[in-house]
Each structure stands twice: as structure tokens, then as C-alpha cells.
UniProtKB/Swiss-Prot annotation:
Glycans are attached at residues 363, 387, 543, 586. GO terms for cellular component: lysosome; membrane. SUPFAM superfamilies: (Trans)glycosidases (SSF51445). Hydrolyzes the galactose ester bonds of glycolipids such as galactosylceramide and galactosylsphingosine. Enzyme with very low activity responsible for the lysosomal catabolism of galactosylceramide, a major lipid in myelin, kidney and epithelial cells of small intestine and colon. This is Galactocerebrosidase. It is found in: Lysosome. The keyword Lipid metabolism applies. It comes from the Eukaryota. It catalyses: a beta-D-galactosyl-(1<->1')-N-acylsphing-4-enine + H2O = an N-acylsphing-4-enine + D-galactose; beta-D-galactosyl-(1<->1)-sphing-4-enine + H2O = sphing-4-enine + D-galactose; a D-galactosylceramide + H2O = an N-acyl-sphingoid base + D-galactose. Its EC number is 3.2.1.46. Keywords: Disease variant, Disulfide bond, Glycoprotein, Glycosidase, Hydrolase, Lipid degradation, Lipid metabolism, Lysosome, Signal, Sphingolipid metabolism.
Length: 669
């Protein structure tokens, strides 16, 4: 007797009541012996770094639609947790995010876009949990060392100001704060941070540590009772669904505080579907946080399209609601932080897993996944082979769930396009005459959610505009008097921080500019370049003309560049190749084939000094390139054979103040 049938290709998706005797595993879902661990939610990371960079430039209504798919309850991913980078001015994977304190006496709580993003998330879901975590720190924190623990009080003060600023300027309550992403922790610093938070009346802000591996933080907590007391959650990254004995012995909440990081294809969706269940089944992790929230960065940067959805074309408005959004919905739309897992969770006989959660008020949500090995391999760690095959799974509801009359059914099938379904609602399942028992026929690469809740929905908007390449002619004069965001559209800083700037002393043509504002190397998380650089455009550009007005602020030692065909960014920025046209305050110019300046095509003298505006022009066509200063040719037809294509860019010789204006690029692929 088939209770409900949705179609999957030409085959039915049967839900069978117990009246039909079928072989297979039997799984009891029961709360008679109490409940399991408290569920803390499903979330995603914005940052680590600059992963939401292009999102802010999207025109309406598309930007709001993207945000709805991510945060709006019972619409799309419906995330419970948003974790953001506390910008520290350093390169943190796909770019830099600005600090709220570039310098020791500087405070600005409107830089970057994480404040805005948190407010947009809260606007859609007032109950969303907010987390902050630093990847890099501004250089002054280290007092000459590439280390944030030189002065523990100073670093704790810096983090505390971010939390206080979030509340004072944006009315945002930060719920959790981390230590240092995937880097060393300092036991005394964690204690100092807790004391400082308490002193500031921030007792409610919980500490999560150490956003790296389970060890040595777990063992350290077992050996230090004060440390054990001040850490609320142990957060591990990419745990492969498993934890360690020491972590469990702490009796603290265990989270996969960064996971996924996989191309958002159906394989990435399968990865997410598997770990959302098995992080708890195997490792007792009660929250899973995906990196990253939305792939809103140039796709050729590291980890392209490793977000829950893709929004990397603000110039066209095009975005893609990828399958991980709907895999997330299977859990997020039918649970809430504060629900509890049942103790009766586990693996299916022929592969896959099941979890069940309750709000303690009679509601029940069951999530069953049968992700195959080939369909669910995450980017890391290595996934040992396992087999999943067709099976029947019989579930028996006992305890307070034995009287449930009806379950709503939601279904996903990943893989072949002809059989593919994403978050499809099937007919509900009636249990009144079934002795609270039902059987699922399961194929591989499926997800079922069965729930008493009727709130689920597959949200949708009209299709966004079609995909378009970056405009071949693009210009920006940076003439923005009161910018809503601190950074100019589409520029993606890869080392250094480039911000809108107002020249109070220059009422003329260059009153509003883009300025590189770091004068000191940050405490780095990745291999930042020794030069600052911001990229823009289409990675496929080959023939292009870049023109920009430039202003060197540092006498004698200062220098700036414009560039084309820049072929690397993110954590690989130090080794970027391209064609770079430099001028220096000492009256010299240089043409190099790399950002580091090792490959020199030409050099010589020019009439250049600091504190004066110049117009640089770089022309690249085929195998030849030329450069002009104030409209006069400085070098011409220099052979350049590599790379064949890449972004346009601007930047400085070192961590120094410099300004850019009237940027213009004209390109062909």
C-alpha cells in the first residue's frame, strides 16, 4: 500500500506503510529514555576572506532576492547561524577585509560589508545567531611581530571594541566570538578575553575555540579547569564527521565550526547532505557551519564557487540558486536551535544515515540521507570508500511520538538530470492506521525530510538576468560624497585596503579618490604580497588598455602601478604574474612581468615625484605592450608572452598611502 508517491523521472518515490511487509532495516525513534544533545543550528561563513565582496554591488531587486534565499525563514537555506570575519586588513583566502582599527587610535565601524550583511540577516531572521572570528589582525597589534599575542590585553581590547561597536553602531548582538582562525591559540589570551568581556558587561557573549583541530585545545581544557570554564564551545574545522575522545570528555558543545568548502555542484550538495547528518551521528557535533555563505568573488580566485549559492556578477544581476541551498533546507526549515536530537540516530544498514530532532512540544523532524561516495566527497578531509545501495528502511515511532497522525514529506534526488529533484514536497504520510510505522524505499543520493511541521516552502523568484561577462569598457571616477560602503564596486583587494577617500585640501578634480590606507603590514594569515594590489574585471581579458590617475604620497621610496593580465589572487597573490607598469617617487619607472618585481621587462627614468598627480596608461595587445605617462609614450612594444590573460589591477610598491582616480579599462578577450 503506497501512502504517497512523488515522481522521480519515470520511477515513483514510494513511502510504504507497515501493512506491506518488506525486507530491510528497522529503526526505532523514541524519546522514552530521554533526549540526545541540544541542536545549535546550521550556518555559513562570510569572510575568510572577502567571499561576499561582489554581493554588495548587486542591483535591486536581485541583491535582496539573494539574501532571501540565504536567510529568510522557510524560503531557502533559512540559515540559523551567520559567522563573519572580523576584518584584520590581511589576505584571508580570496581577498582582504578591512579592520575597524587600521591604526592604534583609529576606530570606524562602517568599513567593509560584514556589518551590513549581519543587519540584512537579522532583518530576515531576528533569531539568527551571530559569530565573529579574526583571521588576520592590523599590524599595530603585533608591535613589530607577526603575532597577535604580544600584548594580550591589547588584542582582547581590539576584539572587544568590535563586539561593542556592533551593538553601539548597528544594534547587533554578537553571540559567539572566536580566537584566531586555524592558527595558534594562547591559553592566557582566552582567559584575558573572557575577563575583559565580563568587565564590559558582555557576559552573554560565548567563546568558541579554537577553530582549528580538536587538539590540542581539548587536552588543554582537560588540564586547565579555568580554561575549561571560559570556553563554551569547541569548534573544529573539516572534522570529517568525527571527533576525538578528549573533546567528548570536556562535556562541552562540539561544533563543526567550518566545513563544506566544496564546489557547489551536486557533489558539493551531496557532501553537505552527508555531513549535516553524520557530523552528529558520528561526532556528536550539534552545529555545522559551511564555508562559504555565497560565492560572491571572482570565480578564478581560490575555491571558486565554493559557496551555498553563486552570485558573482553584480554587473549583470545574474545569480544561481545552487543545490546546497535546498540540501540545507532539508534541515534548517524544519528545526531550530534549541531543539534536541533524539538518542535514536544512526546509520542505515546499506549506507546512509538518519537523524531525528524534536522541540519537546510534540514536533518531530526526521532527516534521512543516502549520499553515495562519489556523490558526496567534500574537498577535505580524505573520504574512505563506503557503499550505498537500494534498501527499504522501516521507522517505528515510539514514546511521545507514537500518536503522531501525519508527517509532511520533502524529497531531494541528486545526480542524473533526468532523475534530479531538489526539495520537492511529496504527499503527506498518514500514520493513523499504521501502528506509527512506515517504510521508505531508498535509492542512493536521496534526502528525505519527514516532519510534523507544515511551515516548509521552496521559495522562488522570477529568473534573474542572464549571465554576462564583465563590461569591456569600465570606468570609475570614485566621486562619491557619502559612500554607503567603504570600497569601490568590483575592486577586489588582494593585499592592502583600498577605500573611498575625500581630499579636504583638494576641491578640484581629485577631491574624491580611491586610497590605499595601510601603512604597515598586517599580522598575516596567508602569504600576503609585499606590495598592495586590488584586482578588477574579467579574468579572460587578453587585449586591454588600462588608464588611471595616480598620486604617490610617500617621498623618495613611494611607488604605484597599474597592471593587466594579472593571473593569480587570493592566497596565491604573492606569485601573481601579469604586466605591471610602475612609477616611483625617486623619478624612475619599471615594467615587470610579476607583482614581486623579479621579472623586469624595462626600466628607466621619468619626471615623477611624490605629492603630484600623473596619468598612467598601459596598453597590452597580443604579444606586445606599451606604456604612457601623461599621454606621452615611455616604453613601446615590449614583448610579453605570459600570461595570456587576466584581471586589471592597481596597487602600491609597499604598504604606503597612495591615491587613484579616474580609473578606465577597455578590453577584449
Amino acid at each position: 500500500m503506497t501512502a504517497a508517491a512523488g515522481s522521480a523521472g519515470h520511477a515513483a518515490v514510494p513511502l510504504l506503510l507497515c501493512a506491506l511487509l518488506v525486507p530491510g532495516g528497522a529503526y526505532v525513534l523514541d524519546d522514552s529514555d530521554g533526549l540526545g544533545r541540544e541542536f545549535d543550528g546550521v550556518g555559513a561563513v562570510s569572510g575568510g576572506g572577502a567571499t561576499s565582496r561582489l554581493l554588495v554591488n548587486y542591483p535591486e531587486p536581485y541583491r535582496s532576492q539573494i539574501l532571501d534565499y540565504l536567510f529568510k525563514p522557510n524560503f531557502g537555506a533559512s540559515l540559523h547561524i551567520l559567522k563573519v570575519e572580523i576584518g584584520g586588513d590581511g589576505q584571508t583566502t580570496d581577498g582582504t577585509e578591512p579592520s575597524h582599527m587600521h591604526y592604534a587610535l583609529d576606530e570606524n565601524f562602517f568599513r567593509g560589508y560584514e556589518w551590513w550583511l549581519m543587519k540584512e540577516a537579522k532583518k530576515r531572521n531576528p533569531n539568527i545567531i551571530l559569530m565573529g572570528l579574526p583571521w588576520s589582525f592590523p599590524g599595530w597589534i603585533g608591535k613589530g611581530f607577526n603575532w597577535p599575542y604580544v600584548n594580550l590585553q591589547l588584542t582582547a581590547y581590539y576584539i572587544m571594541t568590535w563586539i561593542v561597536g556592533a551593538k553601539h553602531y548597528h544594534d547587533l548582538d554578537i553571540d559567539y566570538i572566536g580566537i584566531w582562525n586555524e592558527r595558534s591559540f594562547d591559553i592566557n589570551y582566552i582567559k584575558v578575553l573572557r575577563r575583559m568581556l565580563n568587565y564590559q558587561g558582555l557576559d552573554r557573549v560565548k567563546i568558541i575555540a579554537s577553530d582549528n583541530l580538536w587538539e590540542p585545545i581539548s587536552a588543554s581544557m582537560l588540564l586547565d579547569s579555568e580554561l575549561l570554564k571560559v570556553i563554551d564551545v569547541i569548534g573544529a574545522h573539516y572534522p570529517g564527521t568525527h571527533t576525538v575522545k578528549d573533546a567528548k570528555l570536556t562535556k562541552k558543545k562540539l561544533w563543526s565550526s567550518e566545513d563544506f568548502s566544496t564546489l557547489n555542484s551536486d557533489v558539493g550538495a551531496g557532501c553537505l547532505g552527508r555531513i549535516l547528518n553524520q557530523n552528529y551521528v558520528n561526532g556528536y557535533m550539534t552545529a555545522t557551519i559551511a564555508w562559504n555563505l555565497v560565492a560572491s568573488y571572482y570565480e578564478q580566485l581560490p575555491y571558486g564557487r565554493c559557496g551555498l549559492m553563486t552570485a558573482q556578477e553584480p554587473w549583470s544581476g545574474h545569480y544561481v540558486v545552487e543545490s546546497p541551498i535546498w540540501v540545507s533546507a532539508h534541515t534548517t526549515q524544519f528545526t531550530q536551535p534549541g531543539w534536541y536530537y533524539l538518542k535514536t540516530v544512526g546509520h542505515l544498514e546499506k549506507g546512509g544515515s538518519y537523524v531525528a530532532l524534536t522541540d519537546g512540544l510534540g514536533n518531530l523532524t526526521i532527516i534521512v540521507e543516502t549520499m553515495s561516495h562519489k556523490q558526496s566527497a567534500c574537498i577535505r578531509p580524505f573520504l574512505p570508500y563506503f557503499n550505498v545501495s537500494r534498501q527499504f528502511a522501516t521507522f517505528v515511532l515510539k514514546g511521545s511520538f507514537s500518536e503522531i497522525p501525519e508527517l509532511q514529506v520533502w524529497y531531494t534526488k541528486l545526480g542524473k538530470p533526468s532523475e534530479r529533484y531538489l526539495f520537492k514536497q511529496l504527499d503527506s504520510l498518514w500514520l493513523l492506521d499504521s501502528s506509527s510505522t512506515f517504510t521508505l524505499e531508498l535509492q542512493e543520493d536521496e534526502i528525505f525530510t519527514l516532519t510534523t511541521l507544515t511551515v516548509g516552502s521552496k521559495g522562488s523568484y522570477p529568473l534573474p538576468p542572464k549571465s554576462e561577462p564583465f563590461p569591456q569598457i569600465y570606468e570609475d571616477d570614485f566621486d562619491v560624497d557619502y559612500p554607503f560602503f567603504s570600497e569601490a564596486p568590483n575592486f577586489a583587494d588582494q593585499t592592502g585596503v583600498f577605500e573611498y577617500f575625500t581630499n579636504i585640501e583638494d576641491p578640484g578634480e581629485h577631491r574624491f579618490t580611491l586610497r590605499q590606507v595601510l601603512n604597515q603590514r598586517p599580522i598575516t594569515w596567508a602569504a600576503d604580497a609585499y606590495n598592495t594590489i586590488s584586482i578588477i574585471g574579467d579574468y579572460k581579458w587578453s587585449n586591454l588598455t588600462v588608464r588611471c590617475d595616480v598620486y604617490i604620497e610617500t617621498p623618495e621610496k613611494g611607488g604605484v602601478f597599474i597592471a593587466g593580465r594579472v593571473n593569480k589572487g587570493g592566497i596565491l597573490i604573492r606569485s601573481a604574474r601579469g604586466i605591471f607598469f610602475w612609477i616611483f617617487a625617486n623619478g624612475t619607472y619599471r615594467v615587470t612581468g610579476d607583482l614581486a618585481g623579479w621579472v623586469i621587462y624595462a626600466l628607466g627614468r621619468v619626471d615623477v615625484t611624490a605629492k603630484k598627480w600623473y596619468t598612467l596608461t598601459l596598453i597590452i595587445k597580443g604579444r606586445l605592450s606599451s606604456g604612457m605617462l601623461n599621454g606621452k609614450t615611455v616604453w613601446k612594444n615590449i614583448p610579453v608572452s605570459f600570461p595570456k590573460n587576466g584581471w586589471a589591477a592597481i596597487g602600491t610598491h609597499s604598504f604606503e598611502f597612495a591615491q587613484f582616480d579616474n580609473f578606465h579599462v577597455e578590453a577584449t578577450r
